[in-house]
Amino acid sequence: MTNLRKNYPLMKIINHSFIDLPAPSNISAWWNFGSLLGMCLIIQILTGLFLAMHYTSDTLTAFSSVAHICRDVNYGWLIRNLHANGASMFFMCLFLHVGRGIYYGSYLYKETWNIGVILMLTVMATAFVGYVLPWGQMSFWGATVITNLLSAIPYIGNTLVEWIWGGFSVDKATLTRFFAFHFILPFIILALVIVHLLFLHETGSNNPTGINPNSDKIPFHPYYTIKDALGLILMLLILMSLAMFSPDMLGNPDNFTPANPLNTPPHIKPEWYFLFAYAILRSIPNKLGGVLALLASLLILLIIPLLHTSKQRSLMFRPISQIMFWLLVANLLTLTWIGGQPVEQPFIIIGQLASTLYFSLIIIFMPLAGMYEDHLLEPKFP
């Protein structure tokens, strides 16, 4: 069996990736989220596949087909609830994974980081087109509002929006193509995950100290397989609790009403995992400016490696930078809260201040903190 594992071409790849992979001996539970994201992706693809067997992507029957899945299909309610709440778990793990990368300086593996950012954007696109499929009120109006943002692009904006819609409004053509996108994108994500891992295994994992771990490596199996299994059990416990006891807690009540182009919901808001970006979009009272800020809030992750000023990689021994990091986390939680509030005072000004602080922390304060800490650590000879 050992010979087969180490010599058979296909098994050899799996062996080098998940079994005999040399891993740092000191990586903490923050390194569990990569494998949890992999499991989330598998759960989403499997539940999505079973949902797609019963779903119809037609404006007249889409809403009814989702109701049919929940009422008439064996365990359809469970599959649907797992898929909807699985998306929330996916994003929770994704944000923690990115946060870990920023805290411990993992972004200095530039290829791995850049592919990770592309992965995050692809997952966000998949979640957006997926939210449109049940064809409830928030699905329809969410699709209308967000696709309409593209009309802010000078000269080609309106043409581009109508091209994406497949007509003059969000309608049957839009729903059909969104279903096609929602079906194909997870497989593109799967391919990108393999590339992400390929680049990660070129360098090996980072570790909490941020120093070279090559002198002290242990095999991935059994040490980290068992550690990942514990994380997986805890994640499944949370997911199953959500899906079984309060499946609609993170959803929007408006989506229980079939889509009606003649009736706008009082507050159009996306799922919780988009609220921080939505708050940044709304904080600028100009359409094009808002769209650019929205894009910048996500694409800023790509320039984080260029903004690294410290001689140390990790924030483990850098208390001032740690304060900046936790300010950023608190700021993102504030933005998430603001994104779910109506557009009125004091929420407008809080959103604008939080948006300004978001960019300031990443572009100005964190690099300055790194430089200042380096200055403090320079030996002072009398």
From Swiss-Prot:
Cell location: Mitochondrion inner membrane
Provide the primary localization: mitochondrion
Q: How is the cofactor bound?
A: Binds 2 heme b groups non-covalently.
Q: Which residues bind heme b b562?
A: 83, 182
**Cofactor(s) required for function per UniProt:** heme b
* Keyword Glycosyltransferase (UniProt): no
- Keywords tagged on the record: Electron transport, Heme, Iron, Membrane, Metal-binding, Mitochondrion, Mitochondrion inner membrane, Respiratory chain, Transmembrane, Transmembrane helix, Transport, Ubiquinone
**Top-rank lineage group of the source organism:** Eukaryota
- Where along the chain is heme b b566 bound? 97, 196
Q: How does it sit in the membrane?
A: Multi-pass membrane protein
The portions of this protein that span the membrane are 33-53, 77-98, 113-133, 178-198, 226-246, 288-308, 320-340, 347-367
Q: Which amino acid positions bind a ubiquinone, per UniProt? A: 201
Query: What GO molecular functions are on record for this protein?
Result: metal ion binding; ubiquinol-cytochrome-c reductase activity
UniProt-listed InterPro entries: Cyt_b/b6_C (IPR005798), Cyt_b/b6_C_sf (IPR036150), Cyt_b/b6_N (IPR005797), Cytb/b6-like_sf (IPR027387), Cytochrome_b (IPR030689), Cytochrome_b_C_euk/bac (IPR048260), Cytochrome_b_N_euk/bac (IPR048259), Di-haem_cyt_TM (IPR016174)
Single GO cellular component term: membrane
Q: What function does this protein fulfil?
A: Component of the ubiquinol-cytochrome c reductase complex (complex III or cytochrome b-c1 complex) that is part of the mitochondrial respiratory chain. The b-c1 complex mediates electron transfer from ubiquinol to cytochrome c. Contributes to the generation of a proton gradient across the mitochondrial membrane that is then used for ATP synthesis.
Additional information: Heme 1 (or BL or b562) is low-potential and absorbs at about 562 nm, and heme 2 (or BH or b566) is high-potential and absorbs at about 566 nm.
Q: Indicate the quaternary assembly.
A: The cytochrome bc1 complex contains 11 subunits: 3 respiratory subunits (MT-CYB, CYC1 and UQCRFS1), 2 core proteins (UQCRC1 and UQCRC2) and 6 low-molecular weight proteins (UQCRH/QCR6, UQCRB/QCR7, UQCRQ/QCR8, UQCR10/QCR9, UQCR11/QCR10 and a cleavage product of UQCRFS1). This cytochrome bc1 complex then forms a dimer.
UniProt-recorded name of the protein: Cytochrome b
Q: What is the lineage of its organism?
A: Eukaryota, Metazoa, Chordata, Craniata, Vertebrata
